[in-house]
């Protein structure tokens, strides 16, 4: 069972390091989000689409009385669609470089577990948002760098 993770208003100490990651299902991929960047895991929020938005931007939702951009995690990582999710979630997380980070929502098919990922086991990815792939138990997960989100475009 997942516990609620709330780092409060101070925000996380963002950066790449070995440690705990939240594993989430995004289409057919399992992705690892740095736990210290995760603020909350919620049942999927109601999303209001924005006309003309890119496919990755599902729209806006309300979180804490404020608008929250919701990104489609499966599209961001190029995952093939998976089965229809039984328990879709929105992961509220800090993204972007530390000096300009902002709160975003990531729409995912399921929150799976918290796991430790050794960065020495990460096989290089694109060097940006997808840090690389690493074995976690019996599966290979895509390790994500939320600091790089939004800097690649």
Language-model regions: role of each:
Residues 1-153:
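An acidic, low-aromatic, low-complexity terminal/linker signal
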């Amino acid at each position: 069972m997942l516990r609620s993770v709330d780092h409060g208003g101070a925000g996380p100490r963002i950066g790449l390091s070995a440690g705990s990651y939240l594993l989430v299902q995004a289409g057919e991929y399992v992705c690892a989000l740095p736990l210290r960047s995760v603020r909350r895991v919620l049942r999927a929020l109601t999303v209001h689409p924005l006309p003309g938005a890119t496919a990755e931007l599902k729209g806006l939702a309300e979180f804490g009385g404020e608008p929250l951009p919701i990104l489609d995690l499966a599209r961001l990582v190029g995952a093939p669609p998976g089965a229809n999710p039984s328990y879709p979630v929105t992961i509220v997380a800090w993204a972007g470089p530390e000096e300009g980070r902002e709160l975003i929502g990531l729409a995912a098919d399921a929150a799976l577990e918290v796991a430790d990922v050794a960065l020495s086991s990460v096989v290089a990815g694109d060097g940006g948002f997808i840090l690389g792939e690493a074995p976690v138990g019996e599966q290979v997960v895509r390790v994500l760098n939320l600091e790089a989100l939004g800097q690649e475009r």
